[in-house]
Amino acid sequence: MFTWIWPFIGGLIGIIVGAFGFLILDLLHLPIIIGAALIYSFSIWFTGFHHLDGLIDFGDGMMVHGSPEKKIDVMRDKRIGTGGIAYLFMIGIITFAAIGSSPVILIFYILLVSEIAAKMGIITWATFSKPFPDGTGRYFIESMNKKLLLLSFILASAIGFLIFNILGIVGITMGLLSGIIIVLIAKKNFKLATGDVLGASNEVERMLALVIMITLFML
């Protein structure tokens, strides 16, 4: 019933990840490439690699040709295929590059907003998805609705503005929009939503929020 507060939990995660980034780059002055690798590694380690596991399974399912049921079966098996490795590499390398492209002085704020945006995307996905009957994502999907999504988006956008001005709102909005994109992709390929799609959406939405905020800042 508290799925709508996930962006604010993401904010707490973002404070920790952002503080780590500040330590690595601002205080210790490590080279930006090494720092980006350490920050991204810390981020996925801190959340227990759960979302990364979902991303790999999602990639495997996306590579399968056939019915949604066949795709879900592949997504749920324990083996790792080429699709999973490819998605892991693509999302990972772009996220790493985005962190490495961030202005050092702003690293804390960018990382903080990106984690809020990632969770904003997850609850957007949950709002518009139909759950798999015995999937772990069912509990999150059933507790979300459009009113709660709007409330969460307004509050998260306000926080984003306080953290990073207009670019903070842009990052949060990107999280919401990318959540809708994941919904459309998942419905086309799987019809029903699973916990693996939830995990994949977190990684994709964080990446897209980072990319768009940094790109616009550099303009």
Please name every model-derived segment:
Residues 1-48, 63-70, 77-78, 84-219:
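Hydrophobic alpha-helical transmembrane segments
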Residues 49-54:
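Juxtamembrane transmembrane-helix boundary signature
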Residues 60:
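Generic anion/oxyanion-binding catalytic loop in active/binding sites
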